[in-house]
């Protein structure tokens, strides 16, 4: 009986990590400070940056995929660790 209980405890602890949710920076400042919890299906953090009107624009957040299209001077960076899109 003790073996069964120990097995159930170990399995429960192992399964608790399955609900892990990624966090990514989500603000548009040069030095990001706020984060968001990504939905379960979001595997990437992204950072888009481009120059518009002589000013650098930045967009950050969570993404399903990692877009690799770079056009019109737009720089796109993707990563898979928490808060890696600073």
UniProtKB/Swiss-Prot annotation:
SUPFAM superfamilies attached to this UniProt entry: Snake toxin-like (SSF57302)
Localization (cell): Secreted
Disulfide bonds: 24-45, 38-62, 66-78, 79-84
GO cellular component assignments: extracellular region
Chain segments annotated as transmembrane: none
Main location (coarse class): secreted
Keywords from the UniProt entry: Disulfide bond, Secreted, Signal, Toxin
Matching InterPro entries: Snake_3FTx, Snake_toxin-like_sf, Snake_toxin_con_site, Toxin_cobra-type
Tissue: Expressed by the venom gland.
Molecular function as annotated in GO: toxin activity
Signal peptide region: 1-21
Family classification: Belongs to the three-finger toxin family. Short-chain subfamily. Orphan group IX sub-subfamily.
Protein name (Swiss-Prot/TrEMBL): Candiduxin-2
Organism per entry: Bungarus candidus
